[in-house]
Design a protein with these regions (language model features):
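Glycine/Thr-rich phosphate-binding loops that ligate phosphate moieties of nucleotide
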Residues: 1-154
């Protein structure tokens, strides 16, 4: 099962505001776990789209720092690591917007960015044996996107 999270179109690298989201590959045997996993994978695959663009421009991503409420889900974090085949670091404070505001105020008061220490809660390492599976699955997800785009009336 695959999910296209195009509630208001898709951003980079597709830049198509007309595409709409949906689930693909649903059968009568699918359950909530399949749909949830498909939604998680779609976020991971969107991230992979961006990291592949960076790689094409000679910017190699060996690790990624993540934040936000979704990072409280360990399954998602490991899935992202497996999908990207990169280390995923999660800080103890997952609310980076508030932390960013604090950092800006500290800099305004004369503190250096070097004075601010990031405390990591977890580092997720990729399961290298899953690389082939996630690469094939990612390419299938991209195929669903391209098929959906090709069906949009001009």
């Amino acid at each position: 099962v695959h999910f296209l999270p195009a509630f208001n179109g898709l951003g980079a690298p597709y830049w198509n505001s007309d595409i709409r989201g949906g689930f693909y590959g649903i059968t009568q045997d699918c359950d909530n776990a399949d749909l949830t996993t498909a939604a998680f994978k779609s976020i991971c695959y969107q991230t992979r789209d961006i990291t592949e663009l960076l790689n094409k421009n000679n910017i190699k991503i060996n690790s990624l720092y993540i934040d936000g409420g979704m990072t409280a889900n360990k399954t998602f974090c490991q899935l992202l690591s497996n999908t990207l085949q990169a280390n995923i670091s999660k800080p103890a404070n997952i609310e980076s917007t508030a932390l960013g505001a604090c950092i800006v105020s500290q800099i305004a008061e004369g503190f250096s960015v070097k004075d601010i220490k990031l405390v990591l809660e977890d580092v997720y390492e990729p399961d290298t044996s899953s690389e082939e599976f996630y690469t094939k699955d990612y390419l299938l997800w991209k195929d669903y996107i391209h098929r959906t785009i090709s069906n949009i009336k001009q």
